[in-house]
Amino acid sequence: MSLSKKRKLESGDSGGAGAGGEGAEEENGGEQEAAPPRPRRTKSERDQLYYECYSDVSVHEEMIADQVRTEAYRLGILKNWAALRGKTVLDVGAGTGILSIFCAQAGARRVYAVEASAIWQQAREVVRLNGLEDRVHVLPGPVETVELPERVDAIVSEWMGYGLLHESMLSSVLHARTKWLKEGGLLLPASAELFVAPISDQMLEWRLGFWSQVKQHYGVDMSCMESFATRCLMGHSEIVVQDLSGEDVLARPQRFAQLELARAGLEQELEAGVGGRFRCSCYGSAPLHGFAVWFQVTFPGGDSEKPLVLSTSPFHPATHWKQALLYLNEPVPVEQDTDISGEITLLPSPDNPRRLRILLRYKVGDHEEKTKDFAMED
């Protein structure tokens, strides 16, 4: 699941990247009085604000209306009917209950739909409306504190945020796995992969060049605005969530991380940072604006079926996750076969572990190696 960018993940905590990156500089020429620091919220306060965001209908509408997402979960669950028939399932972050109902339709004997936000009340109504209250039990509260009457044969969860790890919900799934999943139990989805590729963002290029076109239309030369537009649109440290097309991608995408949800020690890996190195060669001449990060998750295929992949790639149909864009401070011209290499790490932000932080180190051709530190904003 992923909160709409129009909805705040948290109110009152400061955002932004760490001090080690190439962040945008002050350009107003004057000193500003520093605002008093905002009090840092406790973990329980942050969690409560996070849950409250999921109490509104809009975020659930966005998720269920994402046909790529919802159909992938429906098919991923139904393909595993043989493993679910007559078994018990835990749905972590059940929301309105649709995934729990899919599990019941696949033959599960009992589904525990755990939901920490107030939307659990609506989930209970949805379950009742579909005549499944004897098999789908909606349990209000965080999965970390809810007690089940038994261990389960399978866990299903739609835990993915922007850039895969924004919102840090995977930690809750791993907690549930350790506490409630039987040995050898089924995880839906079972794994996730992260990809990165250099991009030339056609829409951004149009916006940067817009100011040089004003004179042609209105007789006023505003080309001096282009450098200011570049600072505004690129010289920041925000992770930008936006849809790209395959035409925006400058080189072959590189997989830099793979997460097997059954892997022991994955919780510690997430805290330390998930990432890896990459290297690619450009397809042709273009301005390099930055890098795009996306993910895919895989559902086991059952006894005889191929695994099912839910992809958020710009080469696949769009999803509500879009792609996570990391803009450089300014465009860098590249040619065919220009070598681009680097390292990327995803980790929790220090001020709010639910907020994604991305550390990027990169080298373009013969240019010096640079770094930039990004964070997801509210």
Swiss-Prot record:
The species this protein was found in: Mus musculus (Mouse)
GO function terms (MF aspect): chromatin binding; histone arginine N-methyltransferase activity; histone binding; histone H2AR3 methyltransferase activity; histone H3R2 methyltransferase activity; histone H4R3 methyltransferase activity; histone methyltransferase activity; protein-arginine N-methyltransferase activity
UniProt xrefs under InterPro entries: Arg_MeTrfase, Methyltransf_25, PRMT_dom, SAM-dependent_MTases_sf
Recorded phenotype for the gene knockout or disruption: Embryonic fibroblasts from mutant mice display growth defects, premature senescence and increased levels of TP53 and multiple TP53 targets. In liver, knockdown disrupts the formation of a cAMP-mediated transcription complex involving CRTC2, reduces the expression of genes encoding gluconeogenic factors and decreases glucose output in primary hepatocytes, it also restores euglycemia in insulin-resistant mice.
Family membership noted in the UniProt record: Belongs to the class I-like SAM-binding methyltransferase superfamily. Protein arginine N-methyltransferase family. PRMT6 subfamily.
UniProt PTM: Automethylation enhances its stability.
Catalysed reactions listed for this entry: L-arginyl-[protein] + 2 S-adenosyl-L-methionine = N(omega),N(omega)-dimethyl-L-arginyl-[protein] + 2 S-adenosyl-L-homocysteine + 2 H(+)
SUPFAM superfamilies xref list: S-adenosyl-L-methionine-dependent methyltransferases
A GO biological-process term: negative regulation of ubiquitin-dependent protein catabolic process
Function: Arginine methyltransferase that can catalyze the formation of both omega-N monomethylarginine (MMA) and asymmetrical dimethylarginine (aDMA), with a strong preference for the formation of aDMA. Preferentially methylates arginyl residues present in a glycine and arginine-rich domain and displays preference for monomethylated substrates. Specifically mediates the asymmetric dimethylation of histone H3 'Arg-2' to form H3R2me2a. H3R2me2a represents a specific tag for epigenetic transcriptional repression and is mutually exclusive with methylation on histone H3 'Lys-4' (H3K4me2 and H3K4me3).
GO cellular component: nucleolus; nucleoplasm; nucleus
Region (Disordered): 1-46
Keyword Amino-acid biosynthesis: no
Identification of the protein by name: Protein arginine N-methyltransferase 6
Binding, S-adenosyl-L-methionine: 60, 69, 93, 115, 144
Alphabetically ordered keywords of this record: Chromatin regulator, DNA damage, DNA repair, Methylation, Methyltransferase, Nucleus, Repressor, S-adenosyl-L-methionine, Transcription, Transcription regulation, Transferase
Active-site residue list: 158, 167
All residue ranges annotated as the SAM-dependent MTase PRMT-type domain in the record: 47-377
